[in-house]
Amino acid sequence: EQHPEDTDLKQMYGSLLVAQGKTDEARFQFQLITEMEPSNAAAWQQLLNLALKSEDIPEVIRICTRCQELFPDAPEYYFYLGIAYFQQEKYQDALDTYKAGLEIIPETNVGLKSDFYGQIGDIYYQIKNMPEAYKAYDEALKYNDKNVVVLNNYAYFLSLEKKDLKKAERMSALAVKLEPNNPTYLDTYAWIFFVQGNYTLAKIYIESALANDTTKSS
C-alpha cells in the first residue's frame, strides 16, 4: 500500500535539492516519485524542467513520450517533444508531433495553437519548404496576431527572399512595438529597411539594436 505522504515528502525534498542546485540528487527523488506514482504530473514536470535546463535531449524525449501515454490531453509534452526532435534534426518526427498536438489543443486556447503553428513554420523553413512555412506562419498569426516570435521570424525570412517587403515591414514594426527593447527584433527591422534601400531608418534601428544588446562586451 502506497502512502501519499511518502511522495509528498519526496516532492518537497526534491524541490529543496533543486533550490540548493543539487540537480542529480533532485532528479533521483523525482524519478522515484514517478515510479511510485506514475500519475504524479508535478514530479514529471520537475523531471522535464531539469532535463530541459541541462539540455539532455534524449531524456526530454523519454519523459515526453511517457507523459503522452499518461496524460494524453496535455499538449505541453507534444510541444517539448517537438523541440527535442527539432534539436536532433529529426524534422519529420517534429512535424508529426506538432500536428498531433494541434489535434488535442482546444480551439479556445488560441495562444498555444499559434505557438504550435509557429513551430511548424520554423520546421518547414528549416527543410526549405517555404510555401508551407509561410502558410503555417499565417495560421499562427490567425490565432494570435501578436505572436511576437512569429512576427519577427516571418518578417525576417520574407526579407531574406526579398519578397512581400511591405508585409515584412508591417510585421516587424509590430514586433518592435510589442518589444521595443529587443535587439533581435530591432535588428530585423533595420535589415528590412536596408533591403528596401531606406538606409537612414536602417541606421537608426541598427544603432538602437546595438544599444539594447546586453550580450556585447562593453
Question: Can you annotate each of these PLM segments?
Answer:
Residues 15, 49, 83, 122, ...:
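Residue-level recognition of tetratricopeptide repeat
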Residues 19, 53-54, 87, 119, ...:
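Register position in tetratricopeptide repeats
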